[in-house]
Amino acid sequence: MKFIKYSLYLILAFITFFYSSCSSDEEITQGDADEELVESSKSFLNGEIVLSTKATLSGVDKTLLPEGCPTKFNFKWSDKDSQKFTISLLDFTVGNMGMIINYKCEVTCMVLNSWEQKEYKGDGWIKFKGENGSCWGTEQDGSSFDGDGTNGSVVNGSSIQGYYNAKTHQIQFIVNYNMMNVRSECFLQTIDKSRLATFDADKAKYEADLAAYKKEHGII
């Protein structure tokens, strides 16, 4: 009986410690990112940048090709808050997705929590996160849409969360539009500024390769 009672005390103590640690870790990750890393990021993570992305519609991969789709993003830092910047994605569509999406969201730089530090190893990492961005565009039937229809173009529940290394220029983030089950994933990659000059040609090649892939696999 004493053994059972002692075991229960140990379990209770462990649970208390676990939740206390998680709470403390969550408080830490809400803190500002290192100022030097942020300042270093501003000179590179700025303006138009082409990244490879995956897009899903209702959980179905519309990108299909393993290398992803070349996608142009715009990064603009706030002149009011040194820890904030806005990520914009304009006129985004993939193959016969039919839908054209525009999205922008202000994100805040943060430190990584202990779990994230184990996944994103090495110096230079900052986390960025933002919610309730603006989304507008054209649906598959050609009709336009503007956010949730009740609050301008703001989509409550939409979000961006990602990670950037100010030293290696690696980046990874996910855009959740919270509309029609559409998501964009920028998988872990190193930014190459030279891709901007070849964007149109690369996008055309992607579309041609996508059409060939669909024909080969009998995808309509």
Would you name each region that the model predicts?
Residues 1-8:
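Bacterial N-terminal signal peptides that target proteins for export
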Residues 8-16:
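Hydrophobic alpha-helical targeting segments used for export or membrane insertion
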Residues 23-116, 120-125, 182-220:
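Acidic/polar, low-complexity intrinsically disordered N-terminal segments immediately downstream
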Residues 122-220:
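Beta-sheet ligand-binding and adhesion/scaffold domains
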